[in-house]
A protein has these predicted regions:
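A bilobed periplasmic-binding-protein/Venus flytrap-type ligand-binding module shared by bacterial periplasmic
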Residues: 77-90, 109-110
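Solvent-exposed, polar/charged alpha-helical surfaces in well-ordered, non-transmembrane soluble domains
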Residues: 7, 22, 26, 30, ...
Length: 161
């Protein structure tokens, strides 16, 4: 089923994706395609860019979250992880850094400056993120994504993605 989906996806590409997230938004703006996949925080970076050309791109596209139907799984959410090496010589400071990064103060900054959603449940998304609307996130465990990685890569290779 996944391979058929991937094959259909590839067959519907207006063009082979090239460049970064910004390039995908520009491609929509220039009429090269009607839809693209990007990390949402680039939408905010473009919207508030110092480059008026980039602001123009984002003013002419709409951000949507996929898989939001009643029986859909929700949108995939990227995560950033942190850890402490087993033999770290500075575990206390490493732990203090991780605790700060997940603190209310740091999580608010991530949202306001980098347009990222908070991982700390005590922190609301920034006002800009709230303007984009609510969405249901996919709750597939990250370990399952990791387990399916090698098979996913084989499928991608077979369908010429």
């Amino acid at each position: 089923k996944a391979e058929q989906w991937a094959k259909s996806f590839v067959n519907n590409l207006a063009k082979r994706p090239q460049g970064n997230d910004r390039a995908q938004v520009k491609a929509i703006y220039e009429g090269e395609c009607d839809i693209a996949l990007i990390n949402n925080y680039y939408f905010g970076k473009l919207k508030f860019s110092e480059d008026p050309e980039q602001r123009k791109w984002v003013e002419n596209v709409k951000l949507i979250f996929p898989n939001q139907g009643e029986n859909d799984r929700g949108a995939h959410v990227n995560i950033s992880g942190g850890g402490i090496a087993k033999y770290s010589k500075n575990k206390e400071n490493a732990l203090a850094l991780l605790e700060f990064l997940t603190s209310e103060k740091a999580q608010k900054l991530y949202g306001e400056i980098n347009f990222e959603y908070p991982v700390n449940p005590k922190v609301l998304p920034s006002l800009e993120l709230q303007k984009w609307g609510e969405f249901r996130e996919d709750n597939l465990p990250i370990i399952k994504i990791a387990e399916l990685g090698p098979l996913s890569q084989k499928i991608i290779d077979r369908v010429g993605w």
